[in-house]
From Swiss-Prot:
Although related to the sugar transporter family, it does not transport sugars. The lineage of its organism: Eukaryota, Viridiplantae, Streptophyta, Embryophyta, Tracheophyta. Disulfide bonds: none annotated. It is found in: Membrane. This is Probable inorganic phosphate transporter 1-3. One of its GO terms (molecular function) is phosphate transmembrane transporter activity. InterPro entries: MFS_dom (IPR020846), MFS_sugar_transport-like (IPR005828), MFS_trans_sf (IPR036259), Phos_permease (IPR004738).
Length: 521
């Protein structure tokens, strides 16, 4: 029963919202700011990379990345993230959250800078070094998912735990926004300093050599917020739940949380034996785990997988959709710097109007209406809006209807973030036992990233027109944007069905949810 919960953990559960909660949100949230900035900023500069390194003076179109290179540049960080989520999720349960937390941040800082310094005498050399460092950048980013979620859930009180974890995740939206603003600022400065003709006017001069610095500056900027929070990450004590329930050191947990809560907590020697009860030490691959949490893990992994197919395929390739409906002019009518500016402006507008508000709506309502309701509603609304865009797609691409298209498209993003994009991150940090919490969150997140890889790689090919003569250079014919959007709508609907496997953690302590507060079974 819940009354068997340790006093130190009960104190955390009923603690009033105070400064240390907000400090933890900022420290963990800045990691997510960097995560989102790094993962999405590359979508702002892929067109520029094509112009710089794959320029063909005989072509009527500016240079573009060959399909395999575009897939690698867009997807390699996602592959690294998947590996990092599994590895650091497991390590966070083995060594402790705090010990591993600094390593992920150092990796992010070093690899962000190294990505921007990618060198080589040829296009192949630059792309190879860029992909190498982006893989390891993703590896560090991957570690931040299970660790940030677990740390925040273990520090929070049960009344506002959902909002605190959601606030950490909402920093992703700010990171995406920052990526857009940095790209806008950098491209504007370079445009004033190095004015250039359009590609149609002069194929050679439309991409000034100085444009090579633009993508490097944008990519490297991601290291700055991570570097600023490193000191504070190292100052955080280990979470009481890890120290007491996994490391079995209730004395240390009580001392740590007395400092954090700024109050004297009584040490409970009588429950030391209960914490060491072998009945509560079942492993991840045991029958007991399968009985208690098997369906929960299936629910968290499947919903995250399906959500990320839709979310990442849209997000990474927004610029292609905007080009298709004419929101971004034809590449040949712009120079390289203007193209970066126009893509950044379009993505920033979408983020400002839909992505960021969606995250903060989740923060506001998650502890009122619950995780289950938000996730179910989000998947349902994403399905509705995706079909509303897809079936009359030929109507939306008419010039008079473009604003309507962008509104509908923005609403799918709003309900992704005021919906499953936030809840799939929050719930796995709440419903599993402390000794497996980080691992299970890592498994759930990695399955999500597998979906992101399917979306990122698959959408590149699927969205190509069915007419061979209209495909991008090097791509085979696909099923077209309309059919791709219908597929994404179906995926969202299936995600809604799998949501019924996920329990509702609202208002319950972590020990109640995981079964760690039960003495006899």
């Amino acid at each position: 029963m819940a009354d068997q919960q340790l006093g130190v953990l009960k104190a955390l559960d009923v603690a009033k919202t105070q400064l240390y909660h907000f400090t933890a949100i900022v420290i963990a949230g800045m990691g997510f700011f960097t995560d989102a900035y790094d993962l999405f900023c590359v979508s702002l500069v892929t067109k520029l990379l094509g112009r710089l390194y794959y320029f063909n003076p005989t072509s009527a179109k500016p240079g573009s990345l060959p399909p395999h290179v575009a897939a690698a540049v867009n997807g390699v960080a996602l592959c690294g993230t998947l590996a990092g989520q599994l590895f650091f999720g497991w390590l966070g349960d083995k060594l402790g959250r705090k010990k591993v937390y600094g390593i992920t941040l150092i990796m992010m800082i070093l690899c962000s800078v190294a990505s921007g310094l990618s060198l080589g005498n040829s296009a192949k050399g630059v792309m190879t070094t860029l992909c190498f460092f982006r893989f390891w950048l993703g590896f560090g980013i991957g570690g931040d998912y299970p660790l940030s979620a677990t740390i925040m859930s273990e520090y929070a009180n049960k009344k506002t735990r959902g909002a605190f974890i959601a606030a950490v995740f909402a920093m992703q939206g700010v990171g995406i926004l920052a990526g857009g603003f940095v790209a806008l600022a950098v491209s504007s400065i370079f445009d004033k300093k190095f004015p250039s003709p359009t590609y149609e006017q002069d194929r050679f001069l439309s991409t000034p050599p100085q444009a090579d610095y633009i993508w490097r500056i944008i990519v490297m900027f991601g290291a700055l917020p991570a570097a600023l929070t490193y000191y504070w990450r190292m100052k955080m004590p280990e979470t009481a739940r890890y120290t007491a329930l996994v490391a079995k050191n209730i004395k240390q947990a009580t001392a740590d949380m007395s400092k954090v809560l700024q109050t004297d907590l009584e040490l409970e020697e009588r429950v030391e034996d209960d914490v060491k009860d072998p009945k509560k030490n079942y492993g991840l691959f045991s029958k007991e785990f399968l009985r208690r949490h098997g369906l929960h893990l299936l629910g968290t992994t499947s919903t995250w997988f399906l959500l990320d197919i839709a979310f990442y395929s849209q997000n990474l390739f927004q610029k292609d959709i905007f080009s298709a409906i004419g929101w971004i002019p034809k590449a040949a009518t712009m120079n390289a710097i203007h193209e970066v500016f126009k893509i950044a402006r379009a993505q920033t507008l979408i983020a400002l109007c839909s992505t960021v508000p969606g995250y903060w709506f989740t923060v506001a309502f998650i502890d009122i209406i619950g995780r289950f309701a938000i996730q179910l509603m989000g998947f349902f609304m994403m399905t509705v809006f995706m079909f509303a865009i897809a079936f009359p797609y030929n109507h939306w691409i008419l010039p008079d209807n473009r604003i309507g298209f962008v509104v509908m498209y923005s609403l799918t993003f709003f309900f992704a973030n005021f919906g499953p994009n936030a809840t799939t991150f929050i719930v796995p940090a709440e419903i599993f036992p402390a000794r497996l919490r980080s691992t299970c969150h890592g498994i759930s997140a990695a399955t999500g990233k597998a979906g992101a890889i399917v979306g990122a790689f698959g959408f590149l090919y699927a969205a190509q027109p069915q007419d061979k003569t209209k495909t991008d250079a090097g791509y085979p014919p696909g099923i077209g944007v309309k059919n791709s959007l219908i597929m994404l709508g179906v995926i969202n609907f299936v995600g809604m069905l799998f949501t019924f496997l996920v329990p509702e953690p609202k208002g319950k302590s972590l020990e109640e949810l995981s079964g760690e507060a039960e003495v006899d079974k």
